[in-house]
Amino acid sequence: MEVGGGSEECCVKVAVHVRPLIGDEKVQGCKDCVTVIPGKPQVQIGTHSFTFDHVYGSTSSPSWMFEECIVPLVDGLFQGYNATVLAYGQTGSGKTYTMGTGFKGGSQTGIIPQVMNALFSKIENLKHQIEFQLHVSFIEILKEEVRDLLDPTFLNKSDTASANTGKVNVPGKPPIQIRESSDGVITLAGSTEVSVSTLKEMGACLEQGSLSRATGSTNMNNQSSRSHAIFTITLEQMRKLNPVSGDGNPNDSMSEEYLCAKLHLVDLAGSERAKRTGSDGMRFKEGVHINKGLLALGNVISALGDEKKRKEGVHVPYRDSKLTRLLQDSLGGNSRTVMIACISPADINAEETLNTLKYANRARNIQNKPVVNRDPMSNEILKMRQQLEYLQAELCARGGSGEVQVLNERIAWLEAANEDLCRELYEYRSRCTIVEQREMDAQDGSPCSVESDGLKRNLRSRESRDNQIVETMIGGDSREIEEGAAKEWEHMLLQNTMDKELHELNRQLEEKESEMKVFGGHTVALKQHFGKKIQELEEEKRAVQQERDRLLAEIENLSAGSEGQALKVHDIHAQKLKSLEAQIMDLKKKQENQVQLLKKKQKSDEAAKRLQDEIQYIKAQKVQLQHRIKQEAEQFRQWKASREKELLQLRKEGRRNEYERHKLQALNQRQKLVLQRKTEEAAMATKRLKELLEARKSAARDNLAIANGNGTNGKINEKGLQRWLDHELEVMVNVHEVRFEYEKQSQVRAALAEELAVLKQVDELDSKGPSPSRGKNGCARGSSLSPNARVARISSLEHMLGISSNSLVAMASQLSEAEERERAFTNRGRWNQLRSMGDAKNLLQYMFNSLGDSRYQLWEKGIEIREMKEQLKELVGLLRQSELQRKEVENELKLREQAVAIALATSATGNSPISLKHIDDDVKSSSSPMSVPAQKQLKYSPGIVNGPARESAAFIGQTRKMIPLGQLPMKNLVANGQAGNGKLWRWKRSHHQWLVQFKWKWQKPWRLSEWIRHSDETIIRARPRSQVLTYRV
């Protein structure tokens, strides 16, 4: 492959991807120490600020990075430019997630899957104009060995080698070697390149290689990549060109242009520290090789990124590792490169994050020279065609002869014939493609299916012909048939509608008839009823008429008689009528009176009933009120009891909170003092280191000036070298001191974060509801605090965590600067100022003397430590003896208490006359020594044996003052008690005073031992100092 086209320099584009805090970092209480400036591609950590081409924070979308950084590289790939995407950063910073090398099951997460989609989408749009061929390869560099992840033989061996991630030796297959062609292109001899034509095939290759890649678990990452992986996509394209003829018209002849470009997608293994990852054995060796390759990459970036070195033509150490050798074109060569720096925002990773940002900032200065990669033959043909066109144009301008015109016509005829032949060739090629496709289908299916497919095709063709004939014959009748079908369909719909309506009418008619039958039955019954009534009325009418006729007959008979009798009868009837009318009036009055009485009675009954109802209602209300009063009283009693109980609990809680508050205040104050002291120590160490680093430059210049002087300044030069060596050693010690303070501060922050996590967990559990038990001691300890105390403690811990995080970031910055200066100083040469062998010998002699003095001091310190250990052993032995004596004294005190209790009980009952002399004799007969209680004098704690030597020595010094009290006679004890105004002198006066003395004490038997101890102490304090017996140690 040969490069063509004009080359233009372009810088390496750098993008920074800040991942969010992960779960483990949140549990540890890590704070975000990286700040992304809104609206600007800037990132800030501590006092350092960096500007890059692109910065993506934790809230940025992954599609933004692809659209802004990767899409231009994919477009350039179709133009023939090589491209490289490089993911660099600390272990666990999200490089594999960002690149997408952990491809599984069609996942679209990461840059590589998006690149594949964009590639095939663009190929689909251009496949009618350009012929494409795609090849992929996938390798990894594990422990400086290149492994092919797409090799089938390697895949068969990968399962057996999964326990050991070392080199897999495949029989009969040579190892992959890195070669460089004559034109400077880096190639891999022996690697597998797979041709792919679909997105699915390329995804299968990526997934296959991802599963074969070496991974492992560390303390910082469960799925840590243990190798550098490079996924390469090679795009070959054949472009067809239409050259222009000499007369300016487009020529029919076709020419081809072959372009080949590569896209390297590099997922580097993360830099790691063995102390933090906790790796050992095989993991440790892998980490060493990873850091070695990244160090070589950093040296290459430093050499290419320094403009001064680049102008001076300083050697670039590409050959220091296989990683830099493979990335030789990507860094400073024929490629467009984008470097993605993945960083962690956690303050615990501040040092590694700062180093990553410095490397990325240095990589921005690297200048690449990308060019279009063309085939040598096509490039030469293109040049010759351009030259031919130029000559033809010049010939036409000068006016050619007739022979030239004939030749031009012949050329045009030949080109037309060539074009016809090309068309025929294209048709034949398309037919061959169809035939090949049919052959593939025939191979996939059975002969019967192939034959049936052919018959079906023939049948379809004949049916199509028949259909065409029928359409031509009955084309005119089709409209009439369609109209008849439409009318028939409309009639059917109308008929169905009318049937439905008829059915509905029938149903309604049946309902009305049934209603009429019901109404007819009622009419007959009414006719019968009213007929009977009419007959009854007619009978009554006839009876009344008969009565009337009879009365008229009587009247006629009477009128026919004499008038006297008529008058007499008339008078009689008149009197009877008057009497009857008088009776009727009386009856009416009585009836009215009865009616009034009935009304009054009804009113009184209603009033009585109303009163009775009111009485019942009042009684019910009375019962309800009594029941309610009882309930209210019970509720008030319960409420009062609960309030009193709550008041007691609140008082108790208040006392406990007050105690906890004082305790937490003391703890916070102590932790703040410790944290402040450690922060001040760290600040002093970093300040001292900074001053030493600044002084190193001036000292180096002074030493260089002294070294360039004449020979008379030999003594001065020697002293200067000695001062320079002392200064370098002091710088090294201070760097170690700052590193030690950094580790201590990390441990303190981890402890604070653990306590904060426990308290937040307890707070969350309490907010959800009280839990029956706590699984961990930390949770139990956190649950013992009250909510207010817990909130105060959480706030204090968060404040201290903030201080600790700021201190960690500051120390990480100083350590990074110190390491960078040390690396730069080491690269320039530490011993360049040694100008002669004599200076080297003098400096070596000085170093030997200093080392001897250090060894002597170390030997003396070792002797002192051994002596102190022996003293500590003796003190621990004495302490154990004192503890044994203390236990014996406690046993003796228990025996004495039991004896005193028996004596008191016996004296109180009067059953047995036991005097104090028997107790005195019992005490005299005891041979075990009695000492002053250690709990009061020494503040004894069970763990004092494991305490520091200073406390042990103080304890032994106090035990020397202990007195064998049991050896003293009771008379001396009594006398001493009397002299010291004690209470034992009253015991010997009489039995009555004995009882009086113990009367109120015996009411509290649990304080008897305390009272006896207090009496013993009083006696001991009252003894003269000359009589005190001490132990000799």
Swiss-Prot record:
Residue ranges, compositional bias (Basic and acidic residues): 453-462
Region described as Disordered: spans on this chain: 443-462, 763-785
Keywords, ordered alphabetically: ATP-binding, Cell wall biogenesis/degradation, Coiled coil, Cytoplasm, Microtubule, Motor protein, Nucleotide-binding
Expression (tissue specificity): Expressed in cotton fibers.
Keyword Transcription: no
Keyword NAD: no
Listed InterPro entries: Kinesin-like_fam (IPR027640), Kinesin_motor_CS (IPR019821), Kinesin_motor_dom (IPR001752), Kinesin_motor_dom_sf (IPR036961), P-loop_NTPase (IPR027417)
GO biological process: cell wall organization; microtubule-based movement; mitotic spindle organization; spindle elongation
Locations listed in the record: Cytoplasm
Coiled-coil boundaries: 525-638, 863-895
GO molecular function (one): ATP binding
Residues reported to bind ATP: G89, Q90, T91, G92, S93, G94, K95, T96
A Gene Ontology term for the protein's cellular component: microtubule associated complex
Kinesin motor domain location: 11-366
Subunit structure: Homodimer.
Purpose: Kinesin-like motor protein involved in the control of the oriented deposition of cellulose microfibrils.
Free-text domain note: Composed of an N-terminal domain which is responsible for the motor activity of kinesin (it hydrolyzes ATP and binds microtubule) and a central to C-terminal alpha-helical coiled coil domain that mediates the heavy chain dimerization.
PANTHER family: CHROMOSOME-ASSOCIATED KINESIN KIF4A-RELATED
Family: Belongs to the TRAFAC class myosin-kinesin ATPase superfamily. Kinesin family. KIN-4 subfamily.
Record protein name field: Kinesin-like protein KIN-4A
Lineage of producing organism: Eukaryota, Viridiplantae, Streptophyta, Embryophyta, Tracheophyta
